[in-house]
Structure formats: C-alpha cells, structure tokens
C-alpha cells in the first residue's frame, strides 16, 4: 500500500496554516499534489501551494495549466481553493485526460510560477465509475459485542454499521460507502468527513450508509504506530492508496461517483440528490 507516502504529505500539510495574505510572496512556491488516483478519463485533481514559510496559499490563481509531458499538449483548467475546515483546505480541479503517462501541473499567482509532476494511469487504482465494484465482506453491529471493535470513531453512529455491504447492494437502495479512520487519520480529514456524513444522513432514509474502518488492528493504537497498522481487506480489494475515500453507488450497485479526501456537507448533499435521479 502507498499509505505511508501520502501520510507524509498530509502530515506536512496539516502542520501549516492557510494564509490569506499573498502580497509578500517571494519566488519560492511549492506545489504539492494531494490526490493520488489519476487515470485516463474524468479526474479530480487536488493540490496545495505553500509559500517559503510553509503557509498555504488560498488566493485565486492567475492560471492553471496541465501539460502532457509525452505530447506537450496543454490543457487550461479552472480551479478554486476549497476550505475543508478552519485553517485547512486545498485547490480542486476537474479535468479529463485522454492519455496515460506523466503530466506537469503549472500554476501562476502574482506573476510567480511553480509546478509539480503527477502520474496518470491507464486505469483507476480504485473502482471504476460506471461499473459494479468488487463485492466486499464487511462487519456490522449485530456481529460484534461492541461497536468500538469495528470503528475508531469515539462516538459511533449505530446506523452506519447496521448493514453489511453485501446486503446493502441487494436491497434496491443507493449506497454510500465511507472509508476512514477517525482516530488514526494522518490528514486530519477522516473525522470531519465522517461527522458531515452523520449530520446529513438523517434526511436520506432511502439510502444505505456504511462506514468502513481502514485498519484491522486499530484498537489501542496511535499515530506513532503507523508502521504496525494493517489495512482491512475491503481497503485492499478496492485498491485504496490513501484515506479517506467516499463512494456513491446507485440502487443497482453501480458506482456513480467517488471522492478522495475531504468533501463538505454541501458536496455530500449534491451527490445524494444526483443519486435520487437515477
């Protein structure tokens, strides 16, 4: 698994604060690609920009260009900074890529340019949109004596563990699957996205909601124990390179959308409302 590589990136970002004052920008800017699963087709590209002092830049960018390093073809994309929660966030862009290989992300702000390289695979590492993902065997509340044996959430919501994935995709309801580890999340976004899901699910009784813990042996572990943690079988079966991830499946079990990292309550609501139309 690639969790350790991205753990370093997220930990680094989480230490620093966002800055709204970009008037004193120097020549040194660092672009950090946060999203990890890029493939031919539709993608969401998440990235952060840090100044020389490690502060996150949040202002509107003058230009954002993605260049294919194989063909030199360039794509001008739109992006804006998305605030996750107080002091943290990232730039988010939607882009459609027609070739695998290495790409260059080039940004410009206040006449200062910076860039980063990212890889695009022929096929997504995680389940493909428009297809049925592999069947998962997941634990549910009725099979354990204590919910805290299957989730690191300090205040677990029983309704997120009442049904297994196998049963969920058979009951003709849309299904939302969140992979996160609230107590051991290096990005600091697992808890907030889980809380967002708890807050909005009460208005969507016609959906299945599942939370799947990322690690098998999370009990009594801390972030100092990352090297000893073992990911769960569902994480392996769906090929997750990072955490958290959230997946939206229609009432036939077909994947309609997926998101890596944090998404807001409004984004969750938007995706749920789209599923209602299928």
Predicted regions mapped to residue ranges:
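Thioredoxin-like thiol-disulfide oxidoreductase module
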Residues: 211-243, 247-255, 271-275
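Contiguous segments within soluble domain cores/interaction surfaces
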Residues: 21-98, 106-150
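Sec-dependent signal peptide recognition
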Residues: 2-9
